[in-house]
A protein has these predicted regions:
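N-terminal alpha-helical "arm" segments
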Residues: 1-41
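Assembly/oligomerization interface modules of large self-assembling protein complexes
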Residues: 30-101
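Short His/Asp/Glu-rich catalytic/ion-coordination signatures at enzyme active sites or charged loops
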Residues: 97-111
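Internal, well-ordered alpha/beta segment that forms a basic, Gly-enriched binding/recognition surface
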Residues: 111-130, 135-136
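Extended, solvent-exposed, turn-rich assembly/linker loops in the middle of proteins
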Residues: 152-244, 255
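Extended oligomerization regions of viral-like shell subunits
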Residues: 207-307
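Conserved small/polar residues in nucleotide/adenosyl-binding loops
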Residues: 321-325
């Protein structure tokens, strides 16, 4: 059996455990039946949400016809994420990672081991790129993807934005640097952060979209947990202003608790996950100073098909999140 055949590798890919992904899976889930296309291009539908209501009508009138809201469709070519792992003869002849010092493994056995471990590593790297793509889309209402070549100085930046014009309507800029809450004469005065978050929630709900949770960078989470008013209100048994209940959602995202923002009790999630950037240093998925007001399932993760020539001389098309090549 050729372990590098597409059929063998497809079966192996399905068995590889997926890297933990928070932003991609929570906010851009993929439906296997609807979101994986059999072509290299995908169709993305966009529809503005409204808060229209039904009218009150006299019984003898019957009903008043309403109008359907339109939508727009864009044909997109998904980003091409491709990475490979070379395997050399000396790696097969020498002891591998985690292998017994007195191992009698043959090069053929080591080759199969490398195939499985390499697929797991490559799958994790691809998942991190998808996670970064999801975060950038949330923060910028679009993203710019640098498509590289085998030369560092030759590349092409390909961008996409999900709004018209030059100003991103989903971006909120505070009028001033955040300040902590203050206590005087037996009364707390909320810091500027409180009104800013309430304004973000209001803007989102006014546009017809739900606001269910708040995701912040690590430094913002530390700032909030150091605020005296938050700590005082969380400890106030006379009113349910909030609660501290640290919960780990993934390895890199955890919930520090919930807080009442003018009647809306919102969970506060902190993201401290990082990836290795092009420079080789760790980069946070969510940059310092970032606050995101959002709800799960705000979008969809669409995938196009991958067509490639196999050893039989014919082209084969793969419909899968990750396609071996």
């Amino acid at each position: 059996m050729d372990i590098y055949s597409t059929y063998f590798m497809l079966a192996a890919v399905r068995e590889v455990p997926l890297e933990q992904s928070f932003f991609k899976n929570r906010y851009f889930p993929t439906d296997n039946a609807m979101d994986i296309f059999g072509t290299s291009r995908v169709l993305a539908d966009y529809k503005e949400e409204t808060q229209k209501r039904a009218p009150f009508v006299l019984p003898r009138i019957g009903s008043i016809p309403g109008t359907r809201d339109g939508f727009s469709t864009a044909e997109l070519e998904p980003a091409n994420i491709a990475v490979s792992m070379p395997l050399t003869l000396d790696q097969l002849q020498n002891r591998g990672f985690g292998e017994s010092l007195l191992s009698q493994a043959t090069p053929a056995e080591r080759e199969r081991h490398f195939l499985v471990s390499d697929l797991a590593e490559l799958s994790a790297r691809i998942s991190r790129s998808e996670e970064l793509l999801a975060v950038n889309t949330i923060l910028n209402n679009g993203t710019t993807m640098r498509h590289r070549t085998d030369r560092a100085d030759v590349y092409e930046d390909i961008g996409v934005q999900f709004y018209n014009g030059t100003n991103n309507p989903t971006q909120f800029t505070p009028s001033a640097k955040w300040t902590h809450s203050t206590y005087a004469d037996g009364k707390w005065t909320p810091g500027s952060w409180y009104d800013d978050i309430c304004a973000m929630i209001h803007e989102l709900t006014q546009s017809g979209r739900p606001a269910r949770e708040i995701v912040v960078a690590q430094d913002v989470g530390d700032f909030l947990m150091e605020d005296g008013w938050i700590l005082a209100m969380l400890d106030n048994r006379r009113a349910e202003m909030g609660r501290i209940n640290p919960t780990e959602l993934t390895e890199f995202v955890y919930q520090i608790g919930s807080f009442n923002f003018k009647g809306r009790v919102m969970p506060i999630l902190v993201s401290d996950g990082t990836y290795v950037g092009d420079s080789g240093s760790d980069v946070a998925y969510v940059p310092d100073g970032t606050v995101i007001v959002i709800a799960p399932n705000v979008g969809r993760g669409l995938y196009g098909a991958v067509t490639q020539m196999e050893t039989d001389g014919h082209f084969h098309t793969c419909l899968l999140y990750t396609s071996p090549s």
